[in-house]
């Protein structure tokens, strides 16, 4: 296991922007604005990474055509349960009950989350290189995830979500090292990364400025129609 903070500087910036932007995916589900932070990416063998996962998870394998590779999104069941419960009016609390499969409703929420994550990642990557992320398959047991060989190296990007009054939770996005290899020079380049960081900073500042503009909202609750004769009485 090794940290690649310096080797893949641009990827760290992409992850930081993703952490700020992906909150918009979870806000409609959780009905509160979560705080999401990114950890420095790490390189591990897929066997080492998957051995640290529980036997029951949501694992979504997606294709990145431009890089001729793939991406794996990993969500723990407690994370899925929380988003599902809150989305349909339940309490904002973690369900730790042991189980081995997701409900049909949870499967729909998993799809919503993964679609949102993919769209945000596409936006966050485009300053470095355009990518399109397409769903391929979904699995619930890490042993059956047809992602890469067990000895292959993967870059694991972990994100932690913090919400009021409950323990923090995390989810992962993993790329095979081979998938990002064609971009290694771009990902290591401080010059290219500075461009990415500059573009991200400008966009983030603009978004923040727009969201802080006060808006005057008026609402007509009713418009009664009264004749002049009744009004004069």
Residues covered by each model-derived region:
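N-terminal auxiliary interaction/assembly segments of multi-subunit proteins
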Residues: 1, 5-233
């Amino acid at each position: 296991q090794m940290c690649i903070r310096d080797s893949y500087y641009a990827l760290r910036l992409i992850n930081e922007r993703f952490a700020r932007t992906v909150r918009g995916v979870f806000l409609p589900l959780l009905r509160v604005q979560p705080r999401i932070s990114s950890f420095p990416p790490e390189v591990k063998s897929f066997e080492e990474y998957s051995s640290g996962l529980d036997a029951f998870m949501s694992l979504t394998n997606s294709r990145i055509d431009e890089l001729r590779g793939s991406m794996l999104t990993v969500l723990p069941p407690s994370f899925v349960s929380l988003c599902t419960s809150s989305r349909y009016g339940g309490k904002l609390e973690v369900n730790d009950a042991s189980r081995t499969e997701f409900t049909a409703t949870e499967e729909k929420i998993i799809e919503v989350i993964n679609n949102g994550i993919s769209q945000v990642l596409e936006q966050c990557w485009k300053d470095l290189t355009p990518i399109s992320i397409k769903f391929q398959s979904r699995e619930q047991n890490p042993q059956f995830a047809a992602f890469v060989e067990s000895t292959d190296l993967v870059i694991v990007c972990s994100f932690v979500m913090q919400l009021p009054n409950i323990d923090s939770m995390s989810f992962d996005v993993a790329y095979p090292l081979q998938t990002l290899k064609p971009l290694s020079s771009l990902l290591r380049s401080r010059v290219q990364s500075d461009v990415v960081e500059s573009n991200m900073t400008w966009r983030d500042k603009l978004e923040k400025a727009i969201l802080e503009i006060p808006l005057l909202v008026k609402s007509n609750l009713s418009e009664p129609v009264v004749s002049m004769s009744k009004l004069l009485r």
